[in-house]
Structure formats: structure tokens, C-alpha cells
């Protein structure tokens, strides 16, 4: 293995220095075919995401899926692209979360960097930046409230790949998932209440939609569904809602396998026939708005619901760079720092 021999610009102080690393999924650099193709190729080549043997999966991916899908995905990204910053909302809000957390921790001398599992800015560059600021301890927060091998674990994998190339490694602490952390539930509760207060109608249901996962992953031991249940149970309790008033569903199914159910789209399209024509949708598995929230739910599902006879549809925004989001990240960071003392 070739080691990186670059010496950090600043040596750690005698007492040591801790830095915070935020890791999110990733995004194409733009909406063009080749940018989207590069991103999808990296994402769909991850064995944590697609567990099929590469000898079987890669020919399908490279010759079929990546020939056509970048066009459709690029058009979808274009609908939600942040024009002022020329970036996807996921990148914009992840950066703003890092900036907000950095401001909270500035007086403590704790720098904050952010990186993407797929695409730019890379996790390796974020680690390098923290070490250049004299950090010999890094606290990593994967921005996924509920654990899954397809998200949290692969983010950690990427962090440790970056460390594999360093001759002098910093000490690292990875923060566990936080599906029912009090600050997370408070932030979700506030987001729902603020959204409902601004509506001209009262939703008959608030549908909770989480990103789906193949059922086989759960059967093999992934705790994702259980953690989604923990989130929604705590949120229902905070809002005083029943299971019927806030049902749990799963979106974004891909491929022929059976995924965890109920599936969001069929569930929502069936509601008008049951007399439920006014709904809101919240996506508590996403820390920031992205393609799956703004387009798949905010555009596509809205259209399908209206075509099925729906009358009113509201989207509860993700936490993004809200005060509640920064409060949560600060709480997670400070708790981790308190337990991560220099030896």
C-alpha cells in the first residue's frame, strides 16, 4: 500500500485537538449526463448498496442502467437544483449544517469539516483538512438518523479507507445512529408544527415516508426498520398522534427484490378512495432535503395523489439548516467530545 507522506500544516498542540467530520451520501456535481453517470456508477458499485456479485452486477450496471438512467436522473435533479449556488440541495444544506455547527463550536476551538461518501467534497479531503488544522482526534457523524449498512456503515467504510493511507492516523470516534435522540425528536416536532401552522388546511393524515431497503437486508440483521419504528413512535408520542394519524411507509424501491413495506406510493395513492384527500408527508430518515424528498415525494408523489382524487398535499421540509438541526448536531458533538478524552 502506498502511504501519503504529506505532513499536516499544523502539528497537534500538546493537549491535542478534536475536529468534527459530517458525512452525507453525495450528489452529482451538475445535472449533465456524464456528471450524473459518474455519481451513479460510484453509488451503485458500492457492495454495501448492491450486494450482488460484481461479475453479475457490473455488466448490467455499466451496459444497461448507466446508459439510460443518467438522462432521467439528470432531468429530476434539474427540477430541484439550487440555481443560486449551482448545487444540489443536499450539498447546499450539508454545507450549511457544517457551517452552523462550526459557529457553535468556534469558541471551543473545534473545527468542523464535511464530506460525501460518493462524489465531492470527498471524505479524504475533509480528514486532510482537519489534520491540517492540528486535529489528532476526529469525531465522525454520519448524517443518517437510523442505522443501515447501506448508509451509516458505508460512510464509516469510506472514512477508514482514508485513514488506511495515512502513516500517522488521528484517533477516531464514530457517533452511533440517533433514531429517537431527544434533540432529533424535538427538531422533527417543531418542523411538523411550523409546517402545519402555515397551511390553509388541516391534514387528515401525516404520512411518514422513510427510504426503503430490500427485505433481505433486514432478514440478514440490518436494524434499519426497527430504528425507523423508534423514530416514528417517539414522534407520534411527541405530537400526540396515533398510528392511523401518522402511518409509516417506505419509498424509493429499486430493482426486482421485495423491499420493506408498506410502499409509500401505493399507500398514498389509495388514500382518496378511503376518504382521505388532505395529507402532509414527512421524511424523518433524511437530515436534509434532496432528490428523494423534493422530487420523488414533493413532485412525483404529489401528482400521483392528486390524480387519484387528492385535494391537498403538503411537504414537511427536512431539518436542513434549521436551529433544531444545529442543536442536534451540537448535542451529538458535545456528548461525543465529553467521552473522547486524550489518553
From Swiss-Prot:
Pathway: Porphyrin-containing compound metabolism; protoheme biosynthesis; protoheme from protoporphyrin-IX: step 1/1
Molecular function GO terms recorded: ferrochelatase activity; metal ion binding
Record keywords, A-Z: Cytoplasm, Heme biosynthesis, Iron, Lyase, Metal-binding, Porphyrin biosynthesis
Positions of disulphide bridges: none
CDD domains given in the database record: Ferrochelatase_C (cd00419), Ferrochelatase_N (cd03411)
Pfam families given in the database record: Ferrochelatase
Principal location class: cytoplasm
EC supergroup of this enzyme: lyase
Record InterPro entries: Ferrochelatase, Ferrochelatase_AS, Ferrochelatase_C, Ferrochelatase_N
GO biological process: heme biosynthetic process
Superkingdom assignment: Bacteria
Enzymatic reactions: heme b + 2 H(+) = protoporphyrin IX + Fe(2+)
Subcellular location: Cytoplasm
Gene Ontology cellular component annotations, sorted alphabetically: cytoplasm
Enzyme Commission code: 4.98.1.1
Role summary: Catalyzes the ferrous insertion into protoporphyrin IX.
NCBIfam families from the UniProt entry: hemH
Protein family according to the UniProt entry: Belongs to the ferrochelatase family.
Official protein name in the record: Ferrochelatase
Organism per entry: Gluconobacter oxydans (strain 621H)
Organism classification: Bacteria, Pseudomonadati, Pseudomonadota, Alphaproteobacteria, Acetobacterales
Amino acid at each position: 500500500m502506498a502511504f501519503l507522506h504529506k505532513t499536516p500544516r499544523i502539528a497537534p498542540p500538546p493537549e491535542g485537538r478534536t475536529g468534527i467530520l459530517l458525512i452525507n451520501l453525495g450528489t452529482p456535481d451538475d445535472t449533465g449526463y456524464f456528471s450524473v453517470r459518474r455519481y451513479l456508477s460510484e453509488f451503485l458499485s458500492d457492495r454495501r448498496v448492491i450486494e450482488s456479485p460484481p461479475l453479475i452486477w457490473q455488466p448490467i450496471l455499466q451496459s444497461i442502467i448507466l446508459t439510460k438512467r443518467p438522462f432521467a436522473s439528470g432531468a429530476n435533479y434539474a427540477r430541484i437544483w439550487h440555481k443560486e449556488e449551482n448545487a444540489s440541495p443536499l450539498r447546499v444544506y450539508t454545507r450549511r449544517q457544517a457551517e452552523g455547527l462550526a459557529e457553535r463550536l468556534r469558541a471551543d476551538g473545534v473545527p468542523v469539516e464535511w464530506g460525501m461518501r460518493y462524489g465531492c467534497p470527498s471524505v479524504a479531503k475533509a480528514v486532510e483538512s482537519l489534520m491540517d488544522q492540528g486535529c489528532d482526534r476526529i469525531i465522525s457523524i454520519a448524517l443518517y438518523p437510523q442505522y443501515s449498512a447501506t448508509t451509516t456503515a458505508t460512510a464509516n467504510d469510506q472514512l477508514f479507507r482514508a485513514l488506511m493511507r495515512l502513516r500517522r492516523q488521528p484517533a477516531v470516534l464514530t457517533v452511533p445512529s440517533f433514531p429517537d435522540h431527544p434533540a432529533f425528536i424535538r427538531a422533527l416536532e417543531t418542523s411538523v408544527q411550523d409546517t402545519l401552522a402555515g397551511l390553509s388546511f388541516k391534514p387528515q393524515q401525516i404520512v411518514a415516508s422513510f427510504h426503503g431497503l430490500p427485505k433481505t437486508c433486514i432478514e440478514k440483521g440490518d436494524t434499519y426498520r426497527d430504528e425507523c419504528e423508534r423514530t416514528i413512535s417517539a414522534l407520534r408520542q411527541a405530537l400526540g398522534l396515533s398510528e392511523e394519524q401518522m402511518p409509516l411507509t417506505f419509498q424509493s424501491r429499486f430493482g426486482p427484490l421485495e423491499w420493506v413495506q408498506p410502499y409509500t406510493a401505493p399507500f398514498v395513492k389509495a388514500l382518496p378512495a378511503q376518504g382521505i384527500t388532505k395529507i402532509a408527508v414527512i421524511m424523518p430518515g433524511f437530515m436534509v432535503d434532496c432528490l428523494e424528498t423534493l422530487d420523488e415525494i414533493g413532485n412525483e408523489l404529489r401528482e400521483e395523489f392528486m390524480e387519484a382524487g387528492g385535494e391537498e398535499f403538503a411537504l414537511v421540509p427536512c431539518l436542513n439548516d434549521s436551529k433544531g438541526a444545529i442543536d442536534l448536531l451540537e448535542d451529538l458533538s458535545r456528548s461525543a467530545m465529553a467521552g473522547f478524552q486524550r489518553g
